[in-house]
């Protein structure tokens, strides 16, 4: 069986470091591993419209921003198909068929949907498209026969929902769809990077992000304002590492060579944590170190992004070509699904059989 990846992002804003450590970095590694036959990376504009229907211009303007971020982190269009979701209409038809296999009560139990409904204040007025987007995601995944979906842990309920749809479809109509597996980041700190304000999720809508395209002075300003341990009032006070975003970011980004270059009095992160926990280490010092680490990590990404910004017609062509390949693949899957449901009425005069 072919090994195929499907992953993507909603174009509601530029991508941030939470995206980077949660999935983008892993996508580049997988892309270059040679272990996968096909890789599809989707700019999920249709899904973004489920809670931005009154502002489609916001979605439209961010399609190129997300594409630029992909290319900046190292996604290679020669190895991965970058495409726009709404340019593959077969996904909508697949979603429509899958809706008949899922109950309202099952959608209501999805913890990711429940959390996002609360965050977006949709409790009393949930758009139907938003409520059913886990079904749309299942269509996205199955249309490309994805075997692997690299994603953060917050997407695990979505993958479970998708696997249920695949199972039911295969039982009711015959073996047609491929059951996917989620691939989580190996570094626990990367599973879900908190916002700079200490909130559980880094989110564009909460304004607590460090963007991949941020300028150096903006990154420094955000890091120096980061939430830390509220009980660590004086340098000599013992500090808490658990739940401290500065150390969570260091877990995700720092490497031994960073200590040798920027903070040679410590050999590694464990030594730095131990000093902070016993007292005598101030927040400003660890924030300055984090700033140095993140500047080193993000500078080459920012440079590549600026280079691609000078080649926008080429970026559009990459999206066109990727979308054409994606539509061809999705059309083949849709044909198989229609055949399994026996609704391919005009193929070989099937309506007469």
Where are these regions (language model features)?
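Extreme N-terminus of proteins, especially the signal/transit-peptide cleavage junction
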Residues: 1-3, 346-347
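N-terminal Rossmann-like or analogous alpha/beta NTP/dinucleotide-binding catalytic cores
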Residues: 2-139, 257, 296-298, 302, ...
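Internal, conserved structured core segments that host functional sites
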Residues: 113-115, 119-169, 173, 194-195
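Conserved nucleotide- and phosphate/pyrophosphate-binding catalytic cores
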Residues: 157, 163-353
């Amino acid at each position: 069986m072919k090994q195929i990846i499907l992953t993507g992002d909603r174009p509601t804003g530029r991508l941030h470091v939470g995206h980077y450590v949660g999935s983008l970095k892993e996508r580049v590694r997988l892309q270059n591993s040679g272990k996968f036959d096909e890789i599809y990376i989707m700019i999920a504009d249709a899904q973004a419209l489920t809670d931005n229907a009154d502002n489609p211009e916001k979605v439209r303007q961010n399609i190129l921003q997300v594409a630029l971020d992909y290319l900046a982190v190292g996604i290679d269009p020669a190895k991965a198909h970058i495409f726009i979701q709404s340019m593959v209409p077969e996904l909508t038809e697949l979603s429509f068929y899958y809706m008949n296999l899922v109950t309202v009560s099952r959608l209501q139990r999805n913890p990711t949907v429940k959390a996002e409904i609360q965050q977006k204040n949709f409790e009393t007025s949930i758009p139907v498209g938003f409520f059913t987007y886990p079904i749309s995601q299942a269509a996205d995944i199955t249309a490309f026969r994805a075997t692997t979906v690299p994603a953060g842990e917050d997407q695990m309920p979505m993958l479970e929902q998708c696997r249920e749809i695949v199972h039911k479809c295969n039982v009711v109509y015959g073996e047609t769809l491929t059951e996917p597996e989620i691939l989580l980041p190996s570094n626990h700190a990367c599973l879900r990077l908190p916002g700079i304000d200490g909130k559980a999720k880094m989110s564009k809508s909460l304004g607590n992000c460090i963007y991949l395209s941020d300028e150096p002075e903006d990154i420094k300003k955000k890091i120096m304002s980061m939430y830390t341990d509220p009980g660590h009032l004086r340098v000599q006070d013992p500090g808490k590492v658990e739940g401290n975003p500065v150390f969570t970011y260091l877990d995700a980004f720092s490497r031994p060579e960073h200590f040798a270059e920027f903070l040679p009095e410590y050999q590694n992160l464990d030594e730095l944590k131990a000093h902070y926990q016993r007292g005598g280490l101030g927040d400003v010092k660890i924030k300055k170190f984090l700033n140095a680490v993140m500047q080193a990590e993000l500078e080459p990404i920012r440079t590549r992004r600026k280079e691609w910004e000078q080649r926008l017609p080429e970026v559009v062509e990459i999206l066109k070509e990727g979308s054409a390949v994606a539509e061809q693949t999705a059309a083949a899957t849709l044909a198989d699904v229609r055949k399994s449901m026996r609704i391919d009425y005009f193929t070989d005069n099937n309506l007469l059989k």
